[in-house]
Amino acid sequence: DNPHYQPWRDRIEQELEAVDEAVILVGHSFGGSVVLKYLAEGSYQKPLRGLFLVSVPNWGPDGWAYEEFAVPHDVGLRLPASRIFLYHSRDDPEVPFAHLGYYEERLPAATARPIDGSEHSFLRGLPALVDDIKTLPR
C-alpha cells in the first residue's frame, strides 16, 4: 500500500459538499490525519459541530516523517470554529502515545482524553467519544 493524500482529500470534500447542515466529523488513525489536514487547508467553510480524532498519527518530522500527510505547524489556527476532542490509548500498539502530545500542543483548545489500555481500533467501542458527542449543542 502506498496511499496518497489527494485522492482521500478529494473524497472527503465530495462527501462534505453533499451535506447542508453542520456536521460532526470523527476521524480514526490515518483517516483522522487526512480529515485534520483537509480542514487545515481552509477550503471547508460550512459549520462544524465537532471534530473527534482517535489514535491520530503525527506525520511531521518529529513523528513518522511523511510530509504528504503532515499538518501545518499552526494547524490549531487554521481549523474552523468547533469543539475538538482527541482520544488515544496510552499503550496503543500502532500509533505511539507521544503522538497525542503533538496534537495537544498544536490544538490547545482541544479536549484530550488519554485512554488506559492498549486499544488502537476500539473494536468494543469508545464510550468517552459517545459521551462527548452528546454534550454538543444542537
Language-model segments: residues:
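Gly/Ala-rich beta-loop-alpha elbow adjacent to hydrolase catalytic centers
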Residues: 26-36
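Conserved alpha/beta-hydrolase "acid-adjacent" motif
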Residues: 93-99
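Short beta-strand/loop motif that positions the catalytic acidic residue
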Residues: 80, 85-88, 92
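Conserved hydrolase catalytic core segment
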Residues: 37-50, 59
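Active-site nucleophile loop of the alpha/beta-hydrolase fold
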Residues: 1, 51-61
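Active-site catalytic motif of lipid deacylating hydrolases and related acyltransferases
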Residues: 1-21
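Catalytic histidine-centered segment of alpha/beta-hydrolase-like enzymes
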Residues: 3, 118-130
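Catalytic histidine neighborhood in serine/cysteine hydrolases
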Residues: 104-121
